Structures are given as C-alpha cells and as structure tokens.
C-alpha cells in the first residue's frame, strides 16, 4: 500500500485530552471556527488586531495590507519595529530577565544555561562589534555556524542592527556556500573553527576559506570566527577575526535599530526546480508576527514550558521555531548541537527525560530512524525513559505516515500528547495547515485544517476549486503577513514560481499536491508536483543534483528522480550516462561511490544519491526530452504501464531496469 493510500484509508480519530483543551489558547473547534469567521469577515482587521496586541512597534502602522503591486504584497508598511527588541528587550522589561532563554546541550553532553539577560548582553556585544567593523542597516551577513547559542546570537545581532542575515546550513559544501555569498552580496561571514556532530569535528572555517577562494566574494571584508573546538585553522590577516576579539570590551547594551516592517529580516536559500537555489526574502513585521502567533496557537506555549525544536538554524524551522518564535514568546528552549544517534539512538529520549522537555518538535525522518533503532535495541526504546514531562508533540519537514505517527503517539507521548503535524514551507514563514492541540480531532497522517487567516484551497491545473475527495494542487488564495516577499534579486522568477499565470496569477502555488477528506475537509499532503525532492525534510532540486553530476569529468549526462523511502521519506535516484562505456559489477559499484562523494562535495552530504544506475543513454522522446515519468517508475521498481509510443530508444528501459 502506498503512503497516500495508507493515509486515505485512515479512520482513527484522537480527540484532544480534556485537561489539555481546558487550558489551551484555542480550546475548541467552536473557538477555531470563530477565529476563521473573524478573518473571513474583516481580513485586514484580523491581522491588524494581532499585530498591535503582540508586537512592540517603534512607530505604529496605519496601513495594513497593500495589494497595489500584487503579488509583491506589503504588510504594515508604514510601521517600524526591531525583531531583536521584540525577542530580547521585552523579556527584560516584563520580568523574564533572569528566566532561562536557552538550555544548550553540546554534542558531548555539556549543558549551558543562558538567561534572557545574558543572551541580551551577548547579542548586544556582538552587534556593537559588528558596528565597529562597519556593518550597518541593509548590509547582508552570511552565517555558517554550528548549532550553538552563538549561532542564535549572530542572527539576533544582525536583526538588532537592521542587517539582513542569510544562514547557510553547516552541512553545505564550499561551492554551495560560495553561491549564496555571491548571490546575496554578503559583506561579512560569521563562521566557526569547527562544528561537532556525532563525536566528529567538521572543518567549517576550512570550508569557508575554500568558498571564498572560489571567487566572486570580494565584498566579504570580514570573516568572524567562533572558537568552538580550538582546532587549527587557516588565517587571512586583515580579514579574519576571532568572535571573542570582536566582542571584547564592547558594551553589553546596544540600541535596537528600528526598521520598516517590510525591511528584509533574512534571506534563506531553498532548492528550486531550475537548479539555482532561490533566495527566499522575508520581512521583519509580518514574519515575526506569525512566528509568535504560531508559537501561541500551534504549540500553545505557556510560561513554564520547556520547548525543544530539533531543527538546525540553517533551515527555516530553526529560524522560526528556534531563533525567533520561542524568544518572542518569552519561552525557555533547548538548543542541541549534536545528532539523535550519538552516543546512541536514545539521545533524544534521554535529553527529554533529563531536561524535562514539555513540547517536542522533530522530523518524521528522525522518528522513523529511531523506531528502527528502538526495535533493534530495547535498551534505547523510549519506554525505557521517563518522558512524563511531555504534553505536546510535533512533526515538521515532510508528511508523516500513519504507522510512524501511531508509534510516536503511543511510545513517546504515552497516548496522552496531541501531535501537531505541521505543514508549511521556507516560503510561508510559519505553520499553514496544522492541528490545534486543544481543539482539532487528530487523524494519523493528516495535517488537518488551515490556521485561522490562512485561505488554503485545492485547485486543478486551471486554478478552479476541486471537490473534497479529489486530488489537486495546493494553493493559498489570499496573502498572509509571513509570506515570502520575493526571490532575492529575481522578481520575475518569484512571480513565475509562486504566482503562475496558468493559475490566474493571484494564487500562491505551494508546489505540493494535496487532497481533502470528503467528510472532514482535512488536508493530506501528497508530495511535490515539481522537480523538487524532499529527503529527510530537506528540499533538494533535481536540477541541482544533475548539474553536480554532469560537472564530473566522467559524466556525459544525468537524470535524477525520487523514489519512496521508509527512512528518509524520499530517496535520490540518479541515472547516469558516462563519456566512456557503461560499467558493471564491482567497477559500477566503485564508480557509484565516487560519484556519491563527488555530489557530497559539490552540494553537501544530504544531496548524495542513494541509488546510481548506469546506462548507455537515457529514455528520451524523439525531440530529445528525457522521459522522467519512466525513470520514476524504474526507480520505484514498478512495471512500465505508461504510453511509450514517443520513446525513441525503448530498449534502454530494460537495460536501466537490470542496472539496479
């Protein structure tokens, strides 16, 4: 049974526990519907009410939504605020100064607690140091850092100055880092000597040096290095500076620079179907508002909660639900440097038990890998740990299959914790379709219903609504405050990617297929409709991987598709044509390993193909177009039932089938 069939045949319903619902921010479906009705009646008034209630404005806004240059929407445009002030200073003023903001656990298990007062001082010292280096409002700063308090502080320091940050995941290669440095026009890079993952030191500074050596980064005048391990690093005098030295003797107060609500808070790169990563630009006001609203609604955050989002700050989940949302909510959160399987696969459960985590938010891929580990070794099964502090569970990054959902519900939540299966994207800024833990009856594998104010729908290829029970294209019909503003430096690509004329130019295209239940109207996400793969919750463009493969001197041609994978959700499958004869046996295995490592070096380890098949050529139409639908069937091990009448070289299908 396919994953989507499994979800559509799922009829188990789990209602919110009464004790949870009684104290929840949104305690019932009636309360949910009332908020949806409010948004329907007065859309701008709905958003304006929350923006005024929840955020501190240096200059109050008078305009709510400007649609005059759609789809380049503007929210709260004449208002001014500062994201760092809203995350830190307000906590100093409202009695949270000595509350722990971050419980940091290093890879080796060392624990550090940082209060809001201490975090504020750390951020201010770094912001002052950046100012002395000439970094100002509007400058772009790339952050290539390990999971750390310093990584979060670097983001907050940029926001404090009005500098736009662009965080690059520490697992990306020198080439990927260089592309982002060039595209965003960075004037500074903040990195670390090394990062620790699973007991191993990874050389971030060396990769950063390689990236800068590739050229095009002449605007980068300062490289600031956090001393994480004390490992030896290369050094360029006049350019490289230790983070400690930049912050030394700086005052621990720094006035937060007010910026317009539409000022770019950050640019975060995500994979596109055309190969070149897209710089998703987010605003300050609308983004921060939704980060805080979803902390309150989806996570039902309370003053005594201990929140733990296991994402990396290099992804949007780490932006919204580590660097901004929890701090804006005045929450205490866990930040974890390591991996879930070190020193063993009980690490997450051990940390929940030791720290008494109450809200736990992780990826389905992590859950599936931990299920496998727990089944292999009873000693690291979650039932061996005291997880009684948990009151809410969440999933993010990809759809979760009902089987994994049930295991998570029973073995981690002890059948007492609602699960918020959150659908959202880099481009949406925060949750879009998700259960509300005190209100929504849960169905395993379904992300259920859109949040109030989010006008999600399912349409056909012409933009017309499809009836419940019919699959279609997921869209959002009205702009919302946290939405992507543009693709950095490429407004035309923004319009074409997200507001295509084929759908009328007014609907936000999520890029995912979806279906709504006939009876409940619940949404189930069916996967990407474009050439973007979702591997372990990470979006990877097929074109990007193909370009990396073809850059290898041995490769003439390559095509990449996805196939379902029990562990990672989707696995990368590459079909490769060499410039020489097709290898077989041990030679093919050896070459496949070489090409995997090549892709890992070009893009990063997450992009390594799981399967590589060699062929004399690829299945193509007579006009030379690669027939990817046939490759998808081959990758899945399915019989070819599609029409192959336009296929120029039918024999290649059997060859590629045998090549597995």
Curated annotation (Swiss-Prot):
Sites where the protein binds CoA: 197-200, 317, 536
GO CC annotations, alphabetized: cytosol
Keywords associated with the record: Acetylation, ATP-binding, Ligase, Magnesium, Metal-binding, Nucleotide-binding
Biological process, per Gene Ontology: acetyl-CoA biosynthetic process from acetate
UniProt modified residues of type N6-acetyllysine: 625
Cofactor(s) required, per the database record: Mg(2+)
Modification(s) after translation: Acetylated. Deacetylation by the SIR2-homolog deacetylase activates the enzyme.
One Pfam family linked to the record: AMP-binding
Positions that bind Mg(2+): 550, 555
Domain of life: Bacteria
Disulfide cysteine pairs (residue numbers): none
HAMAP family from the UniProt entry: Ac_CoA_synth
Family of the protein in this entry: Belongs to the ATP-dependent AMP-binding enzyme family.
PANTHER family in the cross-refs: ACETYL-COENZYME A SYNTHETASE (PTHR24095), ACETYL-COENZYME A SYNTHETASE 1 (PTHR24095:SF14)
Known role: Catalyzes the conversion of acetate into acetyl-CoA (AcCoA), an essential intermediate at the junction of anabolic and catabolic pathways. AcsA undergoes a two-step reaction. In the first half reaction, AcsA combines acetate with ATP to form acetyl-adenylate (AcAMP) intermediate. In the second half reaction, it can then transfer the acetyl group from AcAMP to the sulfhydryl group of CoA, forming the product AcCoA.
Protein name according to UniProt: Acetyl-coenzyme A synthetase
Lineage: Bacteria, Pseudomonadati, Pseudomonadota, Betaproteobacteria, Burkholderiales
Annotated gene: acsA
């Amino acid at each position: 049974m396919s994953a989507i069939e499994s979800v559509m045949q799922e009829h188990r319903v789990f209602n919110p526990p009464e004790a949870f619902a009684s104290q929840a921010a949104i305690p019932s479906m009636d309360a949910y519907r009332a908020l949806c009705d409010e948004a329907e009646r007065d859309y701008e008034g709905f958003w304006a009410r929350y923006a005024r209630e929840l955020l501190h404005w240096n200059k109050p806004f008078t305009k709510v939504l400007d649609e005059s240059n759609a789809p380049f929407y503007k929210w709260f445009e004449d208002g001014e605020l500062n994201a760092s002030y809203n995350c830190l200073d307000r906590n100093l003023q409202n009695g949270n100064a000595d509350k722990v903001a971050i419980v940091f656990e290093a890879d080796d298990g060392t624990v550090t607690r940082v209060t809001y007062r201490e975090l504020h001082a750390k951020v201010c010292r770094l912001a002052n140091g950046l100012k002395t280096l000439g970094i100002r409002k509007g400058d772009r700063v790339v952050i290539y850092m390990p999971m750390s308090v310093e990584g979060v502080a670097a983001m907050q320091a940029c926001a404090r100055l009005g500098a736009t940050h662009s965080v690059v995941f520490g697992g990306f290669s020198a080439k990927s880092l260089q592309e982002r440095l060039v595209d965003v026009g960075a004037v500074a890079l903040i990195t670390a000597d090394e990062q620790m993952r699973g007991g191993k030191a990874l050389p971030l500074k060396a990769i950063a040096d390689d990236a800068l050596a590739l050229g095009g980064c002449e605007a980068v005048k300062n490289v600031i290095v956090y001393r994480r391990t004390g490992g030896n690093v290369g050094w360029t005098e006049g350019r490289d500076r230790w983070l400690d030295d930049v912050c030394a003797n700086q005052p621990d107060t720094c006035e937060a620079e007010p910026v317009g609500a539409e000022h770019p808070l950050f640019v975060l790169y995500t994979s596109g179907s055309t190969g070149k990563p897209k710089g998703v630009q987010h605003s300050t006001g609308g983004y921060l508002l939704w980060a805080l609203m979803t902390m309150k609604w989806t996570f039902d955050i309370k003053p005594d909660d201990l929140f733990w989002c296991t994402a990396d700050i290099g992804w949007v989940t780490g932006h919204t639900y580590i660097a901004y949302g929890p701090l804006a909510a005045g929450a205490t959160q866990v930040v974890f440097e390591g991996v879930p399987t070190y020193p063993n696969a009980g690490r997450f459960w051990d940390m929940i038990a030791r720290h008494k985590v109450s809200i736990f938010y992780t990826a389905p891929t992590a859950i599936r890998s931990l299920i496998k580990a727990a089944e292999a070794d009873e000693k690291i099964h979650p039932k061996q740990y005291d997880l009684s502090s948990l009151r809410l569970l969440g999933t993010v990054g990809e759809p979760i299959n009902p089987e994994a959902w049930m295991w998570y519900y029973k073995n981690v939540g002890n059948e007492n914790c609602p699960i918020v299966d959150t659908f959202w994207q880099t481009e949406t800024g925060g949750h879009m379709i998700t259960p509300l833990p005190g209100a929504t009856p849960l169905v395993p594998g379904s992300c259920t219903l859109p949040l109030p104010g989010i006008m999600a729908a399912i349409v056909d290829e012409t933009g017309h609504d499809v009836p419940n029970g019919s699959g279609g294209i997921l869209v959002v019909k009205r702009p919302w405050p946290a939405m992507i503003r543009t693709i950095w430096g490429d407004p035309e690509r923004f319009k074409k990617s997200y507001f295509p004329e084929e759908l009328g130019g007014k609907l936000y295209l999520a890029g995912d297929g979806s279906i709504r239940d006939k009876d409940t109207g619940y949404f189930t996400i069916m996967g990407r409709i474009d050439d973007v793969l979702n591997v372990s919750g990470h979006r990877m463009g097929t074109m990007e991987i193909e370009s990396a493969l073809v850059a290898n001197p041995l490769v003439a041609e390559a095509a990449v598709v996805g196939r379902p994978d029990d562990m990672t959700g989707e696995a990368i499958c590459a079909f490769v044509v060499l410039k020489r004869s097709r290898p077989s046996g041990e030679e093919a295995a050896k070459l496949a390993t070489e090409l995997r490592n090549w892709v890992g070096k070009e893009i990063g380890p997450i992009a390594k193909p799981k399967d590589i098949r060699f062929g004399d050529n690829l299945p193509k139409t007579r006009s030379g177009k690669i027939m990817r639908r046939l490759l998808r069937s081959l990758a899945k091990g399915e019989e070819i039932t599609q029409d192959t009448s336009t296929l120029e070289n039918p024999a290649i299908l059997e060859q590629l089938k045998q090549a597995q």
